[in-house]
Design a protein with these regions (language model features):
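Helix-turn-helix
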Residues: 12, 23-54, 58
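Amphipathic alpha-helical packing segments from all-alpha helical-bundle domains
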Residues: 65-68, 72-73, 116-143, 154-158, ...
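Generic hydrophobic, amphipathic alpha-helix propensity
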Residues: 9-17, 34, 59-63, 67, ...
Length: 199
């Protein structure tokens, strides 16, 4: 007879927070409502997290780990810049669609009134994402895939990041009804024709 693995309380709290953020778009989540959702006292929440800011940090940590570990796998599996960029952008859109509550955190929607450090953390998430794209484009140029690039790699990376962030904002604005992947194939085709004209 196999024993069910017990989920750590810390993880249960983060899952409940993400769920509350998804189910209550536009609303602030209080520790009182969160403790009710988890089924523990507020004191029990604070035994695992010193503050609500630490809970949000836990969700940011999860997003960073999930996205950037997968990006590293994509870089190992594919060598051409166009495929790498396409898969990395798609990855973030899929992650967002599957984790609407965390999307609210990454876009800073629920961080108003929280510590400045949290806004800096989500800023770093997108900066790191954009830097990764820029590096891919530069490596592609060195291998002459861009021959030479129609646009500067920094501008191209910024354009891709802006498109994805914009799609995530639309997803949030629709209260998670309009998928960020809704027109992605066509959008990517139009964008890649500009960024990779020789492909």
């Amino acid at each position: 007879m196999t024993k069910e693995k017990k989920v750590p309380r810390r993880q249960l709290i983060l899952e409940a927070l993400a769920r509350e953020l998804e189910q209550n778009p536009g609303e602030r989540i209080t520790t009182a409502s969160l403790s009710k959702a988890v089924g523990v006292s507020e004191a029990a929440l604070y035994r695992h997290f010193a503050s609500k800011a630490k809970m949000f940090e836990g969700l940011i940590d999860f997003a960073e780990e999930s996205v950037f570990i997968r990006i590293n796998q994509i870089l190992k599996e594919h060598s051409d810049a166009q495929t790498r960029c396409a898969r990395i952008l798609y990855l973030l859109l899929v992650f967002s669609e599957r984790n609407p509550g965390i999307t609210r955190v990454l876009l800073g929607d629920v961080l108003v009134g929280e510590t400045e450090r949290l806004l800096a953390r989500v800023g770093q998430f997108f900066d790191r994402f954009e830097t990764q794209l820029k590096q891919i484009l530069r490596e592609g140029e060195m291998r002459s895939e861009g021959r030479p690039h129609a646009l500067d790699s920094a501008i191209s990376a910024n354009m891709m990041t802006c498109l994805v962030e914009g799609l995530l904002h639309q997803y949030l604005r629709s209260r998670f009804k309009a998928s960020p992947l809704q027109h992605w194939e066509i959008q990517w085709r139009l964008l890649s024709a500009t960024l990779f004209p020789d492909s």
